Structures are given as C-alpha cells and as structure tokens.
C-alpha cells in the first residue's frame, strides 16, 4: 500500500497563488485538509511560524511520519475534521487553508473505493467510520438515491441511474467500484474524446453524501470565521461548482452589510461584515499549472480577510445546501 502511494504525484493545487495573494505568510496557520502535506509544507517554507495540520484520515499522518519530524514543533498534526477547526487551535489563527479536493493518495488506493478507474471495495469514507458507499448504494430508497445523484452530482440522468442501481441490487449486492461504475455507464451515452468518465458525477455525489462534505464545509467556514484573528486569511480551493457556490455564498454573505431592503418594510439592522474579499473574484489555475497537474483544471481559489467584527452563523438555506428528505 505504501509503495503504491509513494509512486503517485502529490501536487498541491493553487498553492503558489495562495502564497502570492496572502503574502507575507507569517504566524500560525491551520491546514484543514492536510492530506499529503503539500499545503502545510508550502506554508512553512513560505514563512509561516507554525502550521496545524488537520485531517480525518489517519493514513495522512501515517504517510507524513517520514518527513513531519524535520519541522519540529513548527508542524502540529491533529486528527479531526475542519468543521470544528476553531476547537483545534489554542490561539487565534493568522490563516486557514482548505483544499476541498479528494487527496491523490485516497484516489490512488483502490481499497479506499473512491475511484471508478480501479476496482476496489465500494467504501469512499474519508475517516473510515460511519456509513460506507456500499451501505448507501444498497440500502437507500430509490428516490433518495436519485436526489443525491442530482443534488450532489448535478447528474441529469439521476432517476435513470437510481432505478438501474435498485434493479441491480435486487440481483446481488453492489460492493465494488467497477461494479457501480458499470451500472452507471450503461445508463449514459458512451464517452466522447475529451469528456470525463460517465461515472464521474455519480461517484462525486455518493462520496459527498457519505462524508457529509457540504455540511462539513458550511460548518468549517463558520469555524474559520470564529478562529481567525482580525487580518487573518481564509483561503479555500474548490473543485466543482456545487462546493464553489457554497464558498462563494458564504464569503458574499459575510462580507456584505446587507441590501437596501424595502421602504415599506421595517428597517433591518445593518450586518457587520466578518470578512473582506481579497480579491473579490475567484482565482483559477494558469495554463502552466494545468499542464503540470491535470487535476487542477477545474479548481478555483477564493480568499477572504477577517475583520474585527464578531463571528456570526449563516443559515444552511442561505448557503444553498441541498435539503434531502430522509437523509
């Protein structure tokens, strides 16, 4: 297992853009998606005094054992989820970095069940606890499966795929990645040159559901607001439109003072922004980075700077989190 991971490239996406946009890097940063450690190392070498590396996958820290010690006390590793990152730091943070992509070491290990390109058990759990993809695919009602595929994967053929999954699981339990990928492929047109694999959206949707990725993201963004000192930076890298919308809506909501409202309605109290947007628009990878790392092609970086206003919660409906009945 270790040899298979070591052969895979672990290239942190948009790290150079983060270091450039938040310069000068200093103080205490929290890398909420430690993974292979690319962001943590980049931040330390870029000027951070301390980086707290957080991950819910114990394998991340097992793989870091060979190099983490070279940073001494400057690198602190903590198992947990970034949804409660404000409880994992003993001091106000100068920066929080979140890379919302699945780490390459998870994708490249067939036994983790994330990839439709390698046969393995249908798992997809990032933390190895809770309901697995196999449990969800075999036990969820057809309507819930269709809603998950549509809401989390933006899969237009969601109902057709859910129906096919239910029909197949009546014959035998669906327990491998290639078995599920094959069911999905039969429901969709053949892949054309340049198109993504037909199972991409379905696997994304099931992974998001299994790991509660949207709920974790919403909680993590609010936790970052609580944890950052005034002037601290929040840098978030997203990889698909659904999660980017959540980040965009959060940053827009918490950098706004409120709309003009109606002259016929009672005057609402003005909101005090918890962030300023720096820059206001998302930053994409440049052509050179995409050429070096094709996984970067859909990535977007959004950065916000903390103000001194008190942190405020944001309702899930404001962030556009899908509300699935029965899930």
From Swiss-Prot:
UniProt binding sites for S-adenosyl-L-methionine: 37-39, 55, 82, 99, 106
Pfam families (UniProt xref): Methyltransf_5 (PF01795)
Gene Ontology molecular function, alphabetical: rRNA (cytosine-N4-)-methyltransferase activity
Residues covered by region (Disordered): 303-327
UniProt-listed GO biological process terms: rRNA base methylation
InterPro entries on file: RsmH (IPR002903), SAM-dep_MeTrfase_MraW_recog (IPR023397), SAM-dependent_MTases_sf (IPR029063)
Biological role stated in the UniProt entry: Specifically methylates the N4 position of cytidine in position 1402 (C1402) of 16S rRNA.
Record-given protein name: Ribosomal RNA small subunit methyltransferase H
């Amino acid at each position: 297992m270790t040899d298979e991971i070591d052969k895979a490239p672990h290239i942190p996406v948009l790290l150079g853009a983060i270091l450039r946009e938040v310069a000068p890097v200093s103080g205490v940063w929290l890398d909420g998606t430690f993974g292979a450690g690319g962001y943590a190392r980049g931040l330390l070498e870029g000027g951070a005094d301390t980086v707290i590396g957080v991950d819910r996958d114990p394998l991340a820290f097992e793989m870091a054992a060979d190099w983490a010690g070279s940073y001494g006390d400057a690198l602190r590793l903590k198992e947990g989820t970034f949804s409660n990152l404000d409880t994992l730091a003993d001091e106000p943070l100068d920066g929080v970095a979140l890379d919302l992509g699945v780490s390459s070491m998870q994708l490249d290990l067939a036994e983790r069940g994330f990839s439709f390109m390698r046969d393995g058990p249908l798992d997809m759990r990032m933390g190895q606890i809770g309901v697995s993809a196999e449990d969800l695919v075999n036990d969820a009602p057809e309507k819930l499966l269709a809603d998950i595929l549509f809401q989390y994967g933006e899969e237009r053929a969601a109902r057709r795929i859910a129906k096919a999954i239910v029909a197949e699981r009546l014959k035998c339990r669906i327990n491998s990645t290639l078995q599920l990928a094959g069911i999905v492929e039969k429901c969709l047109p053949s892949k054309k040159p340049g198109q993504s694999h037909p199972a991409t959206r379905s696997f994304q949707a099931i992974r998001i559901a299994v790991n509660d990725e949207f709920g974790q993201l919403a909680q993590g963004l609010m936790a970052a607001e609580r944890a950052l000192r005034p002037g601290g930076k929040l840098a978030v890298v997203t990889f698909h439109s659904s999660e980017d919308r959540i980040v965009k809506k959060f940053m827009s909501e918490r950098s706004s003072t409120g709309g003009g409202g109606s002259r016929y309605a009672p005057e609402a109290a003005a909101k005090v922004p918890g962030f300023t947007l720096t820059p206001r628009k998302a930053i994409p990878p440049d052509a050179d980075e995409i050429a070096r790392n094709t996984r970067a092609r859909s990535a977007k970086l959004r950065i916000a700077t903390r103000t001194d206003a008190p942190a405020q919660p944001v309702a899930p409906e404001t962030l556009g989190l899908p509300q699935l009945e029965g899930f």
